[in-house]
Regions:
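Terminal RNA-binding accessory module
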Residues: 374-466
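Generic beta-strand/beta-sheet core signal
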Residues: 35, 194, 227-229, 263-265, ...
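Conserved SAM/AdoMet-binding glycine-rich loop
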Residues: 103-106, 113-115, 218-341, 352
Length: 466
């Protein structure tokens, strides 16, 4: 992994060049529209691009029609995500006819697919700039080229080990944010496209992560979410390896930081050291997202998850013994190729035994480019729908039961924003439970004690306790 400070200087210089160019080109501040699709790591990169463009002198608008630059950060986990982007481009074509000066920028995971690039080049020639995940750090330079060029620029790298630090970012919240600690994935689950578009795992140096978080805390951040496709394998690729548990301890030592969250954790790599660290920590939130995907050992093997039903259940028991009040959430796929009723019953059995606080349930979606897409024995749609409905009913029942344990208790809430209903504010407990309560604007970004009065399943209505 190459933490390239020289490249950082180069890109910051291109930001300055773009700023001067924008001043020359526009009489008043130009506008940009940006839209994110996909995971929280994508969201962080969208924040970075928004921060860069704002630093160049652009102001953000909420409609493509009002923008001088339209930017899409794309996701390709499901093929439907690709279709949505093509739909957006059809809409943008008519906008660009009315405003030929409009710049259209596409980046992210979808752009790493050769067939996508070919299609954009042939059918969407009005798109101005296209780049991928491996040269994301080159955005200021590429955008400068685009501002000086009439034609289409496509610059997609197959791989890169560079991590560029110190770029501007535009955070949604001033008091909490995500921090990427690593990039890429080495797991190659048979249904997942991510390793092919994000590349192999590369970890940031712990010193760079700590420096970034200290800067965020100095800027008012009190809660961070440490992000990676599999945070449990953090540090293995570094010249001087560091475990994720060791990194957590370093982050915990940062004065002024109150809460630490992280995701995603692959069950095969969740160590006893990490469980101990969670149990002993005063800042790591007692919420763990532990994707199960299936409760069937047979299906898990075909998925290439590298654990089985028994190991997953043992892991959950170990976690609950160490952290009894843990809030446990998961991901579950229904209808994976070859899934039988017995396999599905194994999944229901795990849900029964694990008492998840909530679960993200998905119907299997065939993703071209993955081994699973070529598998035979695709499960009929009506069977999948029936299983999905049965699973969802159980997940909701167990979730309501798990959440109800907090009813009548007083919890510390980080207040995030005012809801659509005036005077009602929302925040989260350390268990990642959403709470609505009457309050005022001054509470946003603060930690307050709230009595959880009424459980509504996966969220609560409460009242200030002080």
């Amino acid at each position: 992994m190459n933490n390239n400070t020289q490249e950082s200087k180069i890109q910051l210089e291109y930001i300055n060049k773009c700023t001067e160019l924008v001043k020359e080109k526009y009489e008043k501040a130009p506008a940009f529209f940006i839209q994110n699709a996909g995971c929280q790591m994508n969201s962080l990169q969208t924040d970075t691009v928004a921060g860069i463009v704002k630093s160049m002198g652009y102001t953000e608008v909420s409609r493509e029609e009002d923008a001088d630059v339209v930017i899409y950060n794309t996701c390709t986990v499901r093929e439907n995500a690709n279709l949505k982007i093509y739909g957006h481009l059809g809409h943008l074509k008519s906008i660009k006819k009315k405003n030929p000066e409009l710049k259209i920028v596409l980046f992210g995971c979808m752009m790493q697919e050769p067939e996508v690039i070919e299609k954009i080049h042939k059918e969407y020639s009005f798109v101005d700039l296209v780049f991928g995940t491996h040269n994301f750090h080159k955005f200021p330079e590429l955008f400068y080229r685009s501002l000086n060029t009439e034609g289409q620029i496509i610059d997609v790298w197959k791989e890169s080990d560079e991590i560029v630090e110190g770029m501007p970012s535009d955070r949604k919240y001033s008091f909490k944010t995500g921090v990427n600690i690593m990039f890429g994935c080495n797991n190659f689950c048979s249904y997942c496209i991510v390793p092919y578009v994000r590349g192999r795992e590369k970890s940031r140096e712990p010193e760079a992560i700590i420096e970034e978080i200290k800067g965020l805390v100095a800027d008012g951040v009190t809660e961070v979410m440490l992000l990676g496709q599999n945070v449990n394998s953090y540090g293995k690729t570094l010249e001087h390896p560091v475990t994720f548990a060791q990194l957590l301890k370093q982050v915990e030592a940062i004065e002024g930081l109150k809460r630490i969250r992280f995701m995603t954790s692959h069950p095969k790599d969740l160590s006893d050291e990490l469980i101990r660290t969670m149990a002993e920590s005063k800042k790591v939130c007692h919420h763990l997202h532990l994707p199960m995907q299936s409760g069937s050992s047979r299906i898990l093997k075909i998925m290439n998850r590298r654990y089985d039903k028994e190991k997953y259940l043992e892991l959950v028991d170990k976690i609950r013994n160490a952290v009894p009040d843990i809030s446990l959430t998961t991901d579950i796929i229904v209808g994976f190729p070859g899934e039988t009723e017995k396999d599905f019953q194994d999944t229901l059995d795990v849900v029964e035994k694990c008492d998840f606080d909530s679960a993200f349930t998905f119907i299997y979606s065939k993703r071209s480019g993955t081994p699973a897409a070529k598998m035979e024995n695709q499960v009929p749609e009506d069977v999948v729908k029936d299983r999905f409905d049965r699973l969802l009913a159980l997940v909701q029942e167990k979730g309501r039961k798990a959440s109800s344990r907090f009813e009548g208790t007083v919890q510390e809430i980080l207040v995030e924003e005012e809801s659509r209903e005036k005077g009602i504010f929302t925040g989260r407990t350390e268990y990642n439970l959403l709470v609505h309560f009457p309050g005022c604007q001054d509470l946003i970004g603060k930690y307050v004690k709230v009595k959880l009065d009424t459980c509504k399943g996966f969220y609560y209505f409460g009242s200030l306790a002080e």
